[in-house]
Amino acid sequence: SDVCSSDLQNKDNMLSKKEQSIAAISMYAARGNQDSLKVILARGLDCGLTVSEEKEVLTQLYAYCGFPRSMGALVTLMNLTKERAAQGIKDEAGREPSPVKSSDMFVVGGQNQLKLFGRPALGEVLTFAPALDQFLKAHLFGDIFSRDNLDWRTRELSTVAALSVLDGVKNELNTHIAHAKHNGVTQAQIDEVLIMAARCRNGMVLSESDEPAKTFQTDPTITVRKVFYKNRYDIMLCAEMYLPKDFNEAQHYAALIIGHPFGAVKEQCSGLYAQEMARRGYVTLAFDASYQGESGGEPRHTVSPDALVEDFSASVDWLGLQPFIDRNRIGVIGICGSGGFSVCAASLDPRIKALATVSMYDMGRATRNGLGDSMTDEQRRKLLDEVAEQRWKEAETGEARIRFGTPEKLLGNANAVQKEFFDYYRNPLRGYHPRYQGIRFTSQAALMNFYPFAMIKEISPRPVLFIAGEHAHSRYFSEDAYQEASEPKELYIVPGANHVDLYDPDG
């Protein structure tokens, strides 16, 4: 199955703060990123790891990512402990490993291998290079795995984390994922490590220890659980599931999937909508689109309309596997750009039983024709020429051009639409969130070829609701979609509202 984890995920089968720190330490050490490693080593000490535990993680890693990386990481830890001691911080030293009472570590290592793997170590390469078998048994699984200041579960967690950020080690990674599971690491925890790894490779924060706050006031009566699942392109999606008050896993609930605006993440208005609908008794799922936020997908910041449509169906897949979800009552709310993507998804996936869009954008039409269909043929050709030239540059240098829909500073000649978006996306008291990092400029060509309403009549007889602000610059997208859709359908115009007013209560 493409679904990574079909079990209800909760705090008991996600990584603890200490485990998150160990995974992050292992990743940064393997990558040789000493600046980030120093930060996460300090965080690990602050959340209860001992100096001995951190030393042991870094010592073991020499076997998996090389002596120079291990040595460099240990130097970083050594200097950090000196700095913290000078600041009066008393870090717990932790205990040293117990002595190993054996003169034949090759035998001990073989015994440890059997316990660790659940089977004898196999592989033609061990016959081809018997010295490797000798070193693995006597040293790695003998000397190192006999050191009892880290348990084997933690050692395998560290190993999986390190291998997950290295290139060319897929077979070894899969082998150690199996070893980790054999030693008590859950599939949900593996998925969390792999999401952290994707973020590590792309210079993003790694874990909930670094979690930026949501842009809205959270409701303590609503339980939120982070979940991970794959779409059909094998991209790992990260979502947050909002559970209604007095949630009972033995019941069957209607569910709503909430898609965020184009140029946004799940911690903004889609999360707010998810929370509000959970208050009304639904199980809701707010996800990050492929290539954005905490979701996977490389190269980062790509916009692939097909993937963004697929994300909705993948979310249906995952929800439909939960025992507390009624498969015949799964609906979608698409906000802004996700409105267009969700229309396309509902046209193609009859499992989506109802659809609502809010301040919908047809990103294909907006990119092809400009807002208000104001783009000339000459301007369109010029944009495609710019995209083509940028592709040459990226092919030559590998450096992407990243485009933000909202400028960092508002110019004096900014129009009303730019001011409206700026007041939300660049306002730290309203909608700004650091997890959104823009899109690739070259993605505009793919968007031009996106026609989300091509099969909109196929949504019928399932109901569709289009919601738009009375004064929204985007209102015509909803009106045109309403005209093209078949019954049952409804167009609701919110009096006095503009486009962004429907994102949050501050509008």
Model-derived features with residue positions:
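Short beta-strand/loop motif that positions the catalytic acidic residue
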Residues: 459, 466-468
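Catalytic histidine-centered segment of alpha/beta-hydrolase-like enzymes
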Residues: 497-506
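Alpha/beta-hydrolase-fold enzymes
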Residues: 343-424
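The serine-hydrolase catalytic nucleophile loop
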Residues: 263-275, 289
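Alpha/beta-hydrolase active-site loop
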Residues: 269, 302-323
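Short, small-residue-biased leader/transition segments that mark boundaries at the very start
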Residues: 2-5
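Conserved alpha/beta-hydrolase
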Residues: 276-296
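N-terminal cap/lid segment of alpha/beta-hydrolase-fold proteins
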Residues: 206-251, 503-504
